[in-house]
Amino acid sequence: MFSEITIRHATDHDVTAVRHLAALDEADAPQGDALLAFVDGELVAARSKEGQAVADPFRRTRHVLELLDLQSRQEQAA
């Protein structure tokens, strides 16, 4: 079975969800412009332009964090 992964930029409407994710990860929420990763519609990871990332510690997210890193590098190169 395949999961749908969606990556998009955070908006003001995502603040609460990102803070909740950071609390789960026991880390500070990424500041400024951030990329978010959703698996099957559920937020599982967030990454700032500076590289600060948080992820759901109860899910396998390494591949999602790698996708966020790749997307961020591509945007910075453009």
Locate each region found by the language model.
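Charged, low-complexity, helix-prone segments enriched in Lys/Glu/Asp/Gln
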Residues: 25-30, 38, 71-72, 77
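Acyl-donor binding region in acyl/amide transferases
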Residues: 49-78
